[in-house]
Design a protein with these regions (language model features):
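Conserved, mostly hydrophobic/aromatic
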Residues: 7, 15, 36, 116, ...
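Terminal or standalone catalytic/regulatory effector modules within metabolic enzymes
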Residues: 31, 37-55, 285-295, 299-460
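Active-site beta->alpha loop and helix N-cap motifs at the rims of alpha/beta catalytic domains
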Residues: 48-165, 172, 179-183
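Glycine-rich phosphate-binding active-site loops on the catalytic face of alpha/beta enzymes
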Residues: 116, 176, 222-239
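Catalytic cores of alpha/beta
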Residues: 152-164, 209-225
Length: 460
């Protein structure tokens, strides 16, 4: 019997995050939700990552309300989100009580699969979120942030997979955020994990470097069970490979695929119009759809590269880009080879720019790099360069154990602080994650409600 390969659709989260910086309002995709629900996906990734921040910051949407509406419109498909371990959806570590309540509420509001990762692959930073997911009855997808370095070996990754399984992971995700995993590497890594544990494996990559289609085919050959794809109008470039193309290729190779082609055609026709609107208004820059092989040379993810370019442009120093690109891998090595994913990619990039423009390495460092060297972000894959660490920290003490253990509970004090303002625990969680954004959102919501009531009284 043919082996089945399942699909996760990313258009509602990572595809639009990668191509249009997550600026996809709910009303733009709402008409398609019941159609997506009929397509036959393993799951639809629709929440987490940058969506929470962007809903509040730019779209004036309640992210919790968005999740509830998606759930109501898609009763037959698993909903999936991306969670940054102890960072949840923010950029620094939070206390355990916040992590636990956030996961509990995400599941209560409709989440089925929580993909949990840590920027350093430090499982200590994933443990609380993993346990909370299992306790809430959802699927915990333990995630490896894929990267290459002298210390990132298959043996190391397999060891991590075994730890994640012990923590309660039901599936394992290999997350190649930079799109640098080649076909042979995918085959070897999936084979190594499959030999070690009997669990479904999901591979997530990006088309940035042009490798993704080939990488998926070899991964499937090695036994990968699930792949992440984007409906064709939102595929390619910094996004994922096209759903329809992968389904076609896999069927031709003799694999079973559950997707309904008639439904994916309907999705494609609809999202073409949405994509064209974003191209017309300049939100979708054609360059995001292009292939960029520089990542293979410098091992710098595409999103990080564009950030470096915009930073240098603002400083009138775009002519120093080549120096910064050569400095970035050196800073990464100094910092113990962290995977270049949020938030470590930003920290390493900013430090590389600073080193080049200051004309002296580590003359000036960000507070994030200082916190990183103190151990606040967790255990680094390799030790940080001792000489540089001493220069940065001076007499400052390093964190022992897990940084979150030093943080005081935050939920109860925030509930008290927001009495009369927060309508629910979801509001409390939004405020803890992004206080300024949530405060503004609550004010706007209140004003809207008051105007609405005033209007209806006049009407009556």
């Amino acid at each position: 019997m043919a082996r089945k390969v399942q699909f996760v659709e990313t258009v509602l989260r990572d595809a639009n995050q990668s191509l249009i910086a997550t600026r996809l309002p709910f009303e733009k995709f709402e008409p398609m939700l019941s159609t997506i629900d009929k397509a036959g996906y393993y799951a639809a990734e629709c929440w987490g990552g940058a969506t929470f921040d962007v809903c509040l910051r730019y779209l004036n949407e309640d992210p919790w309300e968005r999740l509830r509406k998606i759930r109501a419109a898609m009763p037959n498909t698993k909903l999936q989100m991306l969670l940054r371990g102890q960072n949840v959806l923010g950029y620094s570590h939070y206390p355990d009580d916040f992590v636990k309540l956030f996961v509990k509420k995400a599941v209560e509001n409709g989440m089925d699969v929580i993909r949990i990762f840590d920027a350093l692959n430090d499982v200590k930073n994933m443990k609380v979120a993993m346990e909370a997911t299992v306790n809430a009855g959802a699927i915990a997808s333990g995630t490896i942030s894929y990267t290459t370095s002298p210390v990132h070996t298959h043996a190391k990754f397999v060891e991590m997979v075994k730890e994640l399984k012990e923590m309660g992971a039901s599936t394992i995700c290999i997350k190649d955020m930079a799109g640098i995993m080649g076909p042979q590497e995918a085959y070897d890594m999936v084979s190594a994990i499959k030999d070690a544990v009997d669990m479904p494996i999901d591979l997530h990559t990006h088309s940035t470097t042009g490798l993704a289609f080939m990488t998926y085919l070899k991964a499937v050959e090695a036994g990968v069970d699930i792949i992440d794809t984007a409906i064709s109008p939102f595929s390619g470039g910094t996004s994922q490979p096209a759903t329809e193309t992968m389904a076609y290729a896999l069927r031709q190779l003799g694999y079973e695929v559950d997707l309904d082609d008639k439904v994916t055609r309907e999705m494609s026709d609809y999202f073409k119009g949405v994509r064209d609107e974003f191209i017309a208004d300049g939100t979708l820059i054609p360059k995001a759809l292009a292939t960029d092989t520089q990542c293979l040379t410098y091992q710098i993810p595409g999103g990080m590269l564009s950030n470096l370019m915009s930073q240098l442009k603002q400083m009138n120093a775009l002519d120093r880009l080549e120096e910064v690109m050569l400095e970035t891998p050196k800073v990464r090595a100094d910092m113990g080879y962290p995977p270049l994913v949020t938030p470590t990619s930003q920290m390493v990039g900013v430090q590389a720019v600073t080193n080049v423009l200051q004309g002296e390495r580590y003359k000036k460092v960000s507070k994030e790099i200082t916190a990183y060297c103190r151990g606040e972000y967790g255990t680094t894959p390799a030790p940080i360069n001792e000489e540089i660490k001493a220069k940065i920290l001076g007499d400052e003490k390093e964190v022992e154990g897990r940084y979150a253990d030093t943080l005081a509970p935050i939920v109860e004090p925030t509930r008290e602080k927001l009495a009369g303002i927060a309508k629910s625990d979801e509001d409390v969680l939004s405020y803890i994650a992004f206080p300024n954004l949530a405060e503004k959102f609550f004010e706007d919501r209140k004003a809207k409600e008051e105007n609405c009531c005033a209007y209806s009284i006049v009407e009556a």
